[in-house]
């Protein structure tokens, strides 16, 4: 039986020498691979009390929405600044070279709601840490964070003070595809 890792295409030396590019689109292009990825993420949520699934831009939307559907929960978006039309709250966080800002609608999370945060990948953890801070600022409680892939050795998990689970663990200097 295939594992999720078997569906992840690896492209050596892209976009530069020494990088092992992990292409998540190969999972999405294979119905069995995509179903397996979602099924494995659902298993990580067994017994977790949650009211809302929050997907981080942009691949967190791809994996978060089917999880929300399967679990009968609403799906909310954590987006890059300037992409949401209503009143928002925002959080700026550090990148390796510079900063980035994410935001959520102010009415996306209600006080006391338990939230599962979903993304495709954890590397350094900065984006998800900022997303969790937004959720807490809105009065929500982070129940769990679920990733499809975790890059071992980058210590992103250690940055997060929450229950974190990943479907698969990958090693090496890696960049994943960018869908937007």
UniProtKB/Swiss-Prot annotation:
GO molecular function, one term: AMP binding
Domain of life according to the entry: Bacteria
Keyword Translocase annotated: no
Pathway the protein acts in: Purine metabolism; AMP biosynthesis via salvage pathway; AMP from adenine: step 1/1
EC number(s) stated in the UniProt entry for this protein: 2.4.2.7
Localization terms from the record: Cytoplasm
Keyword Cytoplasm annotated: yes
Reaction(s) the record says it catalyses: AMP + diphosphate = 5-phospho-alpha-D-ribose 1-diphosphate + adenine
Keyword annotations of the record: Cytoplasm, Glycosyltransferase, Purine salvage, Transferase
Gene Ontology annotations of biological process type: adenine salvage; AMP salvage; purine ribonucleoside salvage
GO cellular component, one term: cytoplasm
InterPro entries attached to this UniProt entry: Ade_phspho_trans, PRibTrfase_dom, PRTase-like, UPRTase/APRTase
Stated family: Belongs to the purine/pyrimidine phosphoribosyltransferase family.
Job of this protein: Catalyzes a salvage reaction resulting in the formation of AMP, that is energically less costly than de novo synthesis.
Assembly notes: Homodimer.
Protein name: Adenine phosphoribosyltransferase
């Amino acid at each position: 039986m295939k594992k999720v890792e078997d569906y992840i295409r690896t492209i050596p030396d892209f976009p530069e020498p020494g990088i092992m590019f992990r292409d998540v689109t190969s999972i999405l292009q294979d119905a069995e691979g995509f179903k397996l990825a979602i099924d494995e993420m659902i298993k990580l949520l067994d017994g977790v009390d949650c009211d809302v699934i929050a997907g981080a831009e942009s691949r967190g939307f791809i994996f978060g929405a089917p999880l929300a559907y399967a679990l009968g929960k609403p799906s909310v978006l954590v987006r890059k600044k300037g992409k949401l039309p209503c009143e928002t709250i925002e959080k700026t966080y550090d990148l390796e070279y510079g900063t980035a800002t994410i935001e959520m609608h102010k009415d996306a999370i209600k006080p006391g709601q338990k939230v599962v945060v979903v993304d495709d990948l954890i590397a350094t953890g900065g984006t998800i840490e900022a997303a969790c801070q937004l959720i807490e600022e809105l009065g929500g409680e982070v129940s769990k964070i679920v990733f499809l892939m975790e890059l071992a050795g980058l210590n992103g998990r250690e940055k997060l003070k929450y229950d974190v689970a990943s479907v698969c663990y990958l090693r090496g200097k890696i960049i994943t595809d960018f869908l937007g």
